[in-house]
Amino acid sequence: MSSTPSSPLHLAVALDGTGWHPGSWREPVARPRDLFAARYWADLVAEAERGLLDFVTFEDGLGLQSSHFLEPDGRTDQVRGRLDAVLLAARIAPLTRHIGLVPTTVVTHTEPFHISKAIATLDYVSTGRAGLRAQITARPNEAAHFGRRTIPRIDAYESLAAQEVVAGLFDEAADYVEVVRRLWDSWEDDAEIRDAATGRFIDRDKLHYIDFEGRHFSVKGPSITPRPPQGQPVVSALAHWTVPYRLVARQADIGYVTPRDADHARAIVAEIRAEQEAAGRADQPLHVFGDLVVFLDDDPAAATARRERLDALAGSPYTSDARIFTGTPAQLADLLEEWRSAGLSGFRLRPAVLGHDLPAITRGLVPELQRRGAFRRAYEADTLRGLLGLARPANRYAAA
């Protein structure tokens, strides 16, 4: 799905702890004592919904957060510990009406049958606003939590051995998402009859074995949960290079990418579109969102000073896999429009300090984009697929 100046711009925020900067929990607006309370997360999502954002993502993992991508660290001066993202989204769903809820689900070591059921349940309790963000893990210590296999230690993603390991995990992730999608379709939409007079609750002919046999999974099905309200909840994944671009092209509705500038964004979009065509999905809608970490203030100097203060608290300059934007909402709007012209259809923003930068997005950036005619002034659909302009897909097992 390509972006044009007349197509709607989509916005999401990524929720993680007190914010994406490791020093964020020490800011006066942070609420570190509330991190494991449902109300804290409900307040964040309510703020995002007031800003008419398309959806929020909830970060998750199978190990404690770490300053090192590939192994635990011993730090005690940063936020550690999480709530389960899927359960958290389900708790918040009844408190919201329009915004999409997209928990991160680690597809390495977990089972697609369980995740398909969990996300289908979230789609029901949110009345059609669920999605998932599929994520792999290459950390050996996280494999040890399950004891089913080992993953060799990787010292750097750049090595050939590391790339082979990671490529295998992404190949497994593609099979995983395929199983999840087939399980969502294993009940036809009208499989439930619920006729008390005749005593027929379901039509057994409309439940289907999926009989998936792949390199990584063998799953018979059907699911135990009826087909979700959206048919297929929205699937997304973060991608930084060709192998995860291929996962996005094969299986996702949204890919989150991390360009350095507009030219890089244009090249990434072109590569994903080529992979999409190679996968036989050129006719399928696929959003490509840019990921950015944001420090937003009304004065650029204030944003820079705040970032420097947080760096001092953390003990080192903040770095990220995504571009770090420091400036005003108007300057960010300029950047988003520039990158949009490169083919991105939306953006997932990572607030550096949730208590500060999330309201700066909803009360500063959103009104600026609205003034430019680039963002909605009201929610126009009741489902996440509807907000994203994605049609409800037909069931692959239903009789033609």
Residue ranges and their predicted role:
Residues 9-15, 56-58, 99-105, 128-134, ...:
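Hydrophobic faces of well-ordered beta-strands that scaffold small-molecule active sites
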Residues 11, 48, 52, 92, ...:
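Conserved, mostly hydrophobic/aromatic
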Residues 7, 111-246, 250-251, 284, ...:
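Internal, glycine-rich beta/alpha segment that forms the wall or movable "lid"
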Residues 5-6, 46-50, 90-97, 123-127, ...:
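Acidic (Asp/Glu)-rich catalytic clusters
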Residues 23-39, 104-113, 136, 149-167, ...:
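Active-site mouth loops of central-metabolism enzymes
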Residues 146-154, 176-181, 265-275, 354-375:
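C-terminal helical cap(s) of enzyme catalytic domains, especially alpha/beta-barrels
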Residues 2-96, 230-233, 382, 398-400:
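N-terminal beta1-alpha1-beta2 module of alpha/beta enzyme domains
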Residues 101-102, 125, 131, 218, ...:
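Membrane-embedded alpha-helical bundles of multi-pass transporters/translocases
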